[in-house]
Each structure stands twice: as C-alpha cells, then as structure tokens.
Amino acid sequence: MERSDAFDLRAFDGLPPGSRGQVEEIARAALAAADPRAAVQRSLRLEGDVLWVCGRAYSLSEYQRVYVVGAGKASAAMAVAVEQVLGNRIAGGWVNVKDGYVASTSAVAIHEAGHPLPDERSVVGSRQIVGLVDQATERDLILCLISGGGSALMTLPVEGITLADMSALTGSLLRSGATINEMNAVRKHLEQLKGGQLARLASPATVIALILSDVIGSPLDVIASGPTSPDESTYVDALSVLRKYDLIATAPPSIVRHLERGAAGKVAETPKRGDRAFERVQNCIIASNEQAAEAAVAKARELGLHALLLSTFVEGEAREVARVLAGILREIDHSGRPLARPACLVAGGETTVTVRGSGLGGRNQELALAAVVPLAGLSNVALLSLGTDGSDGPTDAAGAMTTGLTAS
C-alpha cells in the first residue's frame, strides 16, 4: 500500500484551540515544501520532445532509452511523479524503498527493503539497479531518484564483505552517535554504488539525479552517501571514524582489512572531483530541510506570529538540543526575547541519538521527550519535532510534540 499522506497531531494538551490550528498549519506548510511528488513536478517538465530538468534542457530524440533507478523513503512517490511526466517513454526502472512506502507505478518496479538497517532485500534490489545501469550506453538517459534513507536502501557490499558484516558495523555506528558524514565516509568505502560509484558504473550514459535532501546544508556527497557525486572522503577517513569510536577491535575483520588495504593504496579509491564519470551527470536538489523550514516561517508570519528561523544547521545529541530549545522558549515566556508572543521559532538540522539500552524511537521523539521537564508548567507553549520524510527512526511516527502540560 502507498504510505498515507494524512497528518495526525494528537498531543494538544496545554494549547487553546486557536494555537492548535496554528501549529498544525505551520507543520503542514513545512511538509508540503518537502512533498516528493510536488518537488518532482516543480523540477521536471516535458515540452514536446524536450525534457526540462531544473532549468536544463534534454532532447529525448537523442536518447534510445530512458531508465529510472533510485533509493529512499520518498523515492516511490518521486517515481510516480516521473511516470506522470514521461509515461511510456520510460524503458524500465527499479527503486528501493522502505517497508510501507510503496506506490502504484507501471514502468518502474518498487522494491521494499530494510531501513534503517539494510537487509538482504536491500542487496537484491541494489543488484537490480546495477543490472539496469550497467547495460546503459552513451545513447541512454538515466533518472536517479534519491531521498532520505537511500544509504541503507541502496546497499551492495564490495566483494569479501557480507551484509552481516555491514549490518554489524552500521548498528555499532548508530549506537555510537556517529554523524551522518562519518557514517557515509565508511559506507562509501565498503560498497559498490555509494560515493559516486553509481555514476561511474553508468558512464558514459547521461545521468540526472533528482535529490530530496535530508542532510544539513545539502552537500551532494553526503545525501544517501552521494551515489552520483564526487566523493571527498578517503579510505584513511573511513579508518579514522572507526578509531574515533573505538570500533577497530570490534568491527568485522573483513571490513578492517578492506579499509586498511584501501588506505595503503591497494584498492581503487572512490571517484573524485574531475573524474570523467561525472562529465554527463546533473545533480539537482529539488527539496530540502532548509526549504521546509523557510516554508514554516512563512506560514507562521502569514498567521500573524512573530517568526524566526533560528538555524538549519542544528546538530548534536537530541536531548541536548531539546534543552537548548526549551531554554529559548522559557526566555520568550519570561522576557519576550528574542521574540515577543505570539511567537514561532523554527529550527532544522539533524540530531543524533546515542542508544543506551533497548528503547525504540527516533531523534524527533527523543528530542520532544527531553523537552518535557524543561517546559513543564509553561502555558500555551509547544515544541513539535518531526521528520519531513514521515519516518522517525524504526517507528511509524514522524515525531512528537511536547507542551507545558505534558509532564502532568
């Protein structure tokens, strides 16, 4: 089934009816700005035989076949929008998505796979992508649909490393609190498609990557581990991440050996800037966390609130970020700084959670929970933390909301 677009915000205790409606409208505006179908429709249009992509024109008469590949939680919805534009011009396609994030398509196969930890289905689906891309020639056009979760969903370990090895290391990195940049530096050097290697495999075909960014600042080499962009990280960097989190001794030996061989120059590096693999590649970011945050601020101002975009570069432990945000809300309640009521503060970014024990949740639920005590007793105050892709960790929730009455 296709994932529901319904928005259900339940924790309204502590807010009067008017404020409830405002919170929901602001959240909906942010989500609409990140909507995958709408983003594709804004970026892709067909005029006769000319395909316009992010302002660049492609004459389809110059191509024999058009393929669609991709991976990510929003990539099925993106595929639907692409099919609506290109129809029967698509010769075939394959997209890996998270369980429950499927959609009805005709030319593009939608394949469910493991997320946030990859599973055997991720590998099977990635092999299908390789099969499509590998047969492409310089007369073919490949549309690559990338969105949040693409790193796990497009997983294909290098020879000699098993999925079990990869899963063990990924789990350790997640529990350690490693940043997405650090995790991607490791993944790129243990797999066959990440770090520009999909572009290298597709060359000399023309590649257009439509990208929904869930990463701070939207660096192309970080989003979904950058399958179509130059990789700035190295084997040495990947080894450094394992050392930083004391994982050398506990990581699977096959992984440590491979990274050490790469650091010694015995394994080819991922393609860097200037590599011929990128001569016919266009990377286009069609939606981002920053755009969602800006849309939220615009809606808040439209509703008559004093609104401020604090930052779209928020990082750190979710519980620590929660304390800072709660402190700012308390300052507004106490002194009207930095904004007088009625106020709306918006922040975007990517926090991390260091797992202690066996709890289930995600960074947004963790952040909201950590704000319960600091906000206790405040009237008409709410903190909403949500993932714009509709998924917060291994749960069916997008996030959570806390008010001044949640503790009671």
Residue ranges and their predicted role:
Residues 1-61, 77, 237, 246-271:
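N-terminal amphipathic/basic leader segments beginning at the initiator methionine
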Residues 59-62, 71-102:
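Active-site cofactor/substrate anionic-group-binding motifs, chiefly glycine-
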Residues 69-71, 94-97, 143-148, 174, ...:
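Short beta-strand segments
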Residues 81-90, 107-109, 157-168, 200-204, ...:
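A glycine- and small-aliphatic-rich helix-loop capping segment at beta-alpha/alpha-beta transitions
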Residues 96-138, 186-187:
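Glycine-rich oxoanion-binding loops at beta->alpha junctions
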Residues 159-172, 176-253, 257-258:
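Internal gly/pro-rich beta-alpha loop/helix module
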Residues 187, 205-208, 230-324, 328-333:
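Accessory alpha-helical/coil subdomains and C-terminal extensions
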Residues 310, 319-323, 334-335, 341-342, ...:
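Extended C-terminal subregions enriched in glycine
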